[in-house]
């Protein structure tokens, strides 16, 4: 299996190169695509990262997220990740905001939204990536982000406020 190379950008999100994921330097900027999924009740689906993940194990984040690989676009990546991580295919997402995150990891995140009515059990999760998925009401998630921020990926609070 070959290692994937990810896109490296400048601070304007223009591609300046590609690197093996393991060789990324702290100051280098890469691309991520993330998907907010809601249902007709206004609930929000979150995914808990697999406990064995190197980065942020066990933390809750958007239903789908992935680092954009060489040869991919934000759009193609989010469709691929939705199918791989939670078994959704042929989806029609709506492109939302793009945000730059800077800190321990430096990346641009292109957010997408999707409305779908399924129970948490109806999603086919990729066990190597996702521990579980769960629907949260907006009020429940707001309370969780306020009371237990350490259980959630950094930046999720900002993204939730923009949703």
Label each region the model flagged.
Residues 1-34, 40:
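Acidic, metal-coordinating catalytic segment for phosphate/diphosphate chemistry
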Residues 27-29, 55-60, 134:
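A short, polar/proline- and glycine-enriched secondary-structure boundary/capping micro-motif
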Residues 26-27, 53, 102-105:
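Short glycine/serine/proline-enriched coil/turn segments at secondary-structure junctions
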Residues 45-46, 61-96:
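The catalytic Nudix box helix
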Residues 12, 39-42, 50, 115-120, ...:
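Short loop segments at secondary-structure junctions
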Residues 34-64:
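A glycine-rich, hydrophobic loop/mini-helix early in the fold
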Residues 19-20, 58, 70, 99, ...:
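Nudix hydrolase/Nudix homology domain
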């Amino acid at each position: 299996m070959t290692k994937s190379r990810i896109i490296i950008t400048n601070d304007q999100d223009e591609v300046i190169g590609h690197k093996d994921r393991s060789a990324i330097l702290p100051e280098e900027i890469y691309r991520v695509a993330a998907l907010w999924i809601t249902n007709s009740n206004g609930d929000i689906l979150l995914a808990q990262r697999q406990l064995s993940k190197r980065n942020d194990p066990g933390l809750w984040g958007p239903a789908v997220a992935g680092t954009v690989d060489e040869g991919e676009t934000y759009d193609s990546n989010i469709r691929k990740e939705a199918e791989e991580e939670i078994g959704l295919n042929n989806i029609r997402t709506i492109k939302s905001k793009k945000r730059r995150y800077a800190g321990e990891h430096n990346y641009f995140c292109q957010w997408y939204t999707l409305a779908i009515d399924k129970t948490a059990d109806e999603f086919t999760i990729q066990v190597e990536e996702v521990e579980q998925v769960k629907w949260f009401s907006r009020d429940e998630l707001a309370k969780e982000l306020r009371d237990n921020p350490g259980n959630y990926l950094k930046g999720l609070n900002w993204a939730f406020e923009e949703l």
